[in-house]
């Protein structure tokens, strides 16, 4: 049975491509989006509605409350179990998302040390003293590669990366495997790309649409459900900016524009992260996406069959 990854920056059309491919293959979809895990975070994460999923089974959507936290190990365990279960029913799996570390956790064996309470306490105290931006700058200097994989606004993950560096004496990314997947060696990855101008415009349009659909009201509803209690969910793009607006720190117009700016920056980091993985086959905007992926899958299947003759 197949395991296919559809990855790329935000707003490149990954979800639509994944659904078209899953319908063609009769496959099921697993989300690799760290914020679509949360119930109620629909508008701000561009989560597809049930109707938009077009009858295709989706997994790892709406599985956590906003006050709960997830990590890479948590995601890895659940995603791998789901893949095995779906394959046991003789169905292919399409993984789709832009959280690069989650995708890597599915495919590869990541070896991170357990949390050290004293190191964590020290880093938390330092963060309170110098602030999140300074902590991220510290990470950029110690491990630029890790800074690409982690959202600058997600202080919890920034601190975790710094903790791994301090415990191991090695860069956070040194714990990531460099060779081909040891867990799913036959997995195939396809990356979607767009030119910068087009992608920036799509991001701007998407944020405007989120505001029109009611992102501000959705955020207020989530705040009443404990959004501030979750260390991860409250930092999600869009929601973090609306929280600042709700607290009177910025205007609504500034919140909207800052969401666009932060999303563009996040897209750049996603592009750089995925570009480092030589296993990804890139599909340009001029190529018909579904047909190109299907052609690659057929060619790969023929090659494997020939090798086993």
Language-model regions: role of each:
Residues 1-309:
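Phosphate/pyrophosphate-binding catalytic cores of soluble transferases and nucleic-acid-acting enzymes
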């Amino acid at each position: 049975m197949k395991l296919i990854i559809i990855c790329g920056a935000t707003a490149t059309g990954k979800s639509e491509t994944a659904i078209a491919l899953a319908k063609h293959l009769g496959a099921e979809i697993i989300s690799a989006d760290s914020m679509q895990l949360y119930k109620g975070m629909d508008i701000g994460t561009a989560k597809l509605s049930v109707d938009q999923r077009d009858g295709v089974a989706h997994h790892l959507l709406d599985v956590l409350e906003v006050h709960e936290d997830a990590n890479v190990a948590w995601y890895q365990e659940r995603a791998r179990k789901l893949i095995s279960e779906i394959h046991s029913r003789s169905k292919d799996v399409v993984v789709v998302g832009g959280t690069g570390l989650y995708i890597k956790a599915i495919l590869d064996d990541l070896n991170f040390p357990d949390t050290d309470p004293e190191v964590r306490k020290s880093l938390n105290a330092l963060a309170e003293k110098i602030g999140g931006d300074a902590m991220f700058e510290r990470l950029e200097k110690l491990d630029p590669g890790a800074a690409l994989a982690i959202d600058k606004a997600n202080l919890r993950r920034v601190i975790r990366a710094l903790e791994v560096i301090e415990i191991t004496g090695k860069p956070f990314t040194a714990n990531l495997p460099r060779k081909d997947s040891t867990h799913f060696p036959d997995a195939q990855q396809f990356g979607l790309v767009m030119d910068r101008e087009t992608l920036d415009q799509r991001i701007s349009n998407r944020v405007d649409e989120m505001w029109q659909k009611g992102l501000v009201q959705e955020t207020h509803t989530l705040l009443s459900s404990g959004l501030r209690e979750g260390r991860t969910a409250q930092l999600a793009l869009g929601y973090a900016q609306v929280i600042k607006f709700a607290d009177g720190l910025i205007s609504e117009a500034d919140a909207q524009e800052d969401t666009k700016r932060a999303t563009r920056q996040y897209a750049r980091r996603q592009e750089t992260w995925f570009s480092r993985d030589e296993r990804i086959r890139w599909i340009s905007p001029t190529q018909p996406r579904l047909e190109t992926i299907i052609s690659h899958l057929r060619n790969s299947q023929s090659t494997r069959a020939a090798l086993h003759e």
